[in-house]
């Protein structure tokens, strides 16, 4: 089967654990996920099956939205509730206005130091593997894009934020850095991913929904089409001749203003055909093809 599942990951399960369960339920080897979540986090994780896995890379540019609960007054070595407590300070003097006034510093393009408990590599070794050995190393700062932070409430010591961000953002690092800015320390208490590009929590499936569909023989019915992953790309409808060239691996030329990094191609019958990318000579090359070439007719 080919398609996408918008899964609501439960707490305590790794992202690869979700993939493993989907692989087992669908009896399919080619399964991958579009964005890792920490085991303690919950929420949206898109899972790709079959040929749809070829589109995972196009999700790297989409925005994500998180609901975060941050507890002030305590720091942990993992920056979240899973780690060992490393510091405690009073936060009784912290007010909601103080939190609001600190938030603008975290908007726009910021730099973050990845937590030691992260998948970032140091000299070929995952940081979390070093952290589990009690080894802490200097980490290079990384850029992150924060598009919005909504203050949802503060009942000391816990504050609630909704954060819209780009690829590679560590919400745990935002919690840690915010605590440092407020002078009391903080850690990420809970995290829910509410959206991942076109995939939203309100339309997600629990793993129990997959099991129910399996029992009813309706696993194919709950799959989203592969093109659901590229809905954010510019869309273009092409004639049969152009699509035939693309599905046969040939470039095409287009009369258009502007040049996006990629476009989703559809046929006149609204069939998803390919993703194309521009070349330096002005042509467009098929990066991913989803229609099969028409068989050649035998000569009379």
From Swiss-Prot:
Catalysed reaction equations from the record: uridine(55) in tRNA = pseudouridine(55) in tRNA
Enzyme class: isomerase
Keywords, ordered alphabetically: Isomerase, tRNA processing
BP term (GO), one: tRNA pseudouridine synthesis
Function: Responsible for synthesis of pseudouridine from uracil-55 in the psi GC loop of transfer RNAs.
Family listed: Belongs to the pseudouridine synthase TruB family. Type 1 subfamily.
PANTHER family, per the entry: PSEUDOURIDYLATE SYNTHASE TRUB1 (PTHR13767:SF2), TRNA-PSEUDOURIDINE SYNTHASE (PTHR13767)
Protein name: tRNA pseudouridine synthase B
